[in-house]
Amino acid sequence: VKGQLPCGVVFFVGYLFDGIRTNSGRGKHFSSVKTPQLFIFHFVTYSVLNLFTFLSSYDKIITYMFVNTFKLLSFLAFKLLIMKGSFCMPITEILERNAREFGNDVALVEVNPEIRETRRVTWKEYELIEPNPVCHYRREITWSVFNEKANRFANLLLSRGVKKGDKVGILLMNCLEWLPIYFGILKTGALAVPLNFRYTPEEIKYCLDLAEVDILVFGPEFIGRVEEIADEISKNRLLFYVGENCPSFAEHYDRLTANCASTTPYIELTDEDDAAIYFSSGTTGFPKAILHNHESLMHAARVEQNHHGQTKEDVFLCIPPLYHTGAKMHWFGSLISGSKAVLLKGVKPEFILDTVSREKCTIVWLLVPWAQDILDAIDSGEVTLSKYELSQWRLMHIGAQPVPPSLIARWKKVFPNHKYDTNYGLSESIGPGCVHLGMDNIDKVGAIGKAGFGWKVKIVDDKGNTVKRGEVGELCVKGPGVMTCYYRDPKATAETLKDGWLFTGDMAQEDEDGFIYLVDRKKDVIISGGENLYPVQIEDFLRSHDAIRDVAVIGLPDQRLGEIAAAIIELKPDHPCTEEEIMAFCQKLPRYKRPHKIIFADIPRNPTGKIEKPKLRKIYCGESLVAKQNHG
């Protein structure tokens, strides 16, 4: 005992120092802790832990028991404090914790590789997610490797002069590198700026300039598009390439990060620090840069776990693209619980069911068309459920578009044991969850639900006054996830943010039980298969056709996609044109922007010259579009 006593003292002091350093913000994040609970909690916990370690240093078995017991209690209390919002911290700290607590556990799995772009053309044919039909492909990383990759990229950025407040763009398809790159950016204090993988070269340049991006990280699918603008965009920024066969105008991400330290950079982060910029477009079609801080990101993680109850044993299947706030913020539930997530590159029913079966997925986030395709494939015999192990699948939830009640009724007949939830949100509200249905309210399918965890909602008239229950007004939300502003657009910010309330542009009404239903859209946006289409972009393109005098693009209800773009076209006199000719002309557009329906008719305009789209919707829809979808 005498010989081991000095070792015990050293062990005690070392544990105490390490506990305070690593679990209380490493001594550099105290400014982000709004209350002293975090410091006190870890100090006391590790003091007791180290006391037992010291007292039992002569007995390895007792040491093992006490150390691991208090580690477990520390972890459980830590999670409880996060869920109750007792203290705040940057989202990067959760990754650090996972690397310490669950280092050898699988964090991310990528199933099926992406389609490689040859040059400039094939990207126009992209669906929402594209699989490679040639071969099955799978790779994975653990939490410790995830954190190590994030640290290496962070240290690379710092070595290139990136500092707090700089911006780093991400132009990647879903892949195993995406999230470590995102977190590497956050660890430097820089802002992550995800870009839509469907952007044209002109849109990429516009967004890089608008957000004042300093570095762009891009993948092989974007070589053609980036090459077109490389001379312009590389003058004031660095280009990093992720993948094989690095083009000459960029630097190779893998080679650069391989030589960087894997240790965590000590950069002070607070809740109020800017964290990310996401892009959204208004009715003009020009992207707006949406600025969020670290508090927004952390709140998104709390919301997701509170709504869906993720535990360490859950496995989340993520299919939509990670540049969306929706996909990433739903994944934050896996992050905060330390559980596994699977990135699937394919939307065919057999792909989804096979992945759920192989990876033992318990939570699946779908869009309406994918859920419909699964049910149709089951009904037609295209897939046989008995081939798959699906008993662990507990929750299916849908967001990004109105959900027909008939779809969920069909789903529950096939999967009666599944919980179901609807999530409503905007990029301006850090994605899904500011309003949600709730897993126990399936009788209210068709509604978007009630205020989410930590959120407030109200419905107002044109003067900003709260309307009576049952009356239609504009939906407004307020909470820690509301954007800071539209970056470099104070006018749009002032129109959207008022006294902390985010005016969504969606018209809604509340029923007698307090559940909110969307009625129509104030904003002129079409949501097709979960993706936003901006009519003005399609209209501007169609107006370049020699035979077209005037055009208006509206959304029409579609059972599978929710909405489809319909072009009402007024032809010039003596310029005959057929639907087939218009469709052929539209092949120049990316596939997702092409109108699904062509209608030849006069375009009504009001006295000020504005197209009367409400009148067109009434003519061709018969009722407000969202209400019609809700009745599906």
How does the language model describe each region?
Residues 298-315, 323-363, 377-378, 383:
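Conserved AMP-binding/adenylation subdomain of ANL enzymes
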Residues 199, 216-218, 356, 364, ...:
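AMP-binding/adenylate-forming catalytic core of the ANL superfamily
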Residues 103-106, 258-279, 286, 309-315:
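Conserved pre-ATP/AMP-binding loop-to-beta segment of ANL
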Residues 83-87, 96, 104-175, 179-183, ...:
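Conserved AMP-binding/adenylate-forming core of the ANL superfamily
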Residues 60-61, 70-71, 93-95, 159-160, ...:
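Structural core segment of the AMP-binding/adenylate-forming
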Residues 140-144, 275-299:
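Conserved AMP-binding A3 loop
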Residues 336, 361-366, 375-443, 456:
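Gly/Ser/Thr-rich phosphate-binding loop
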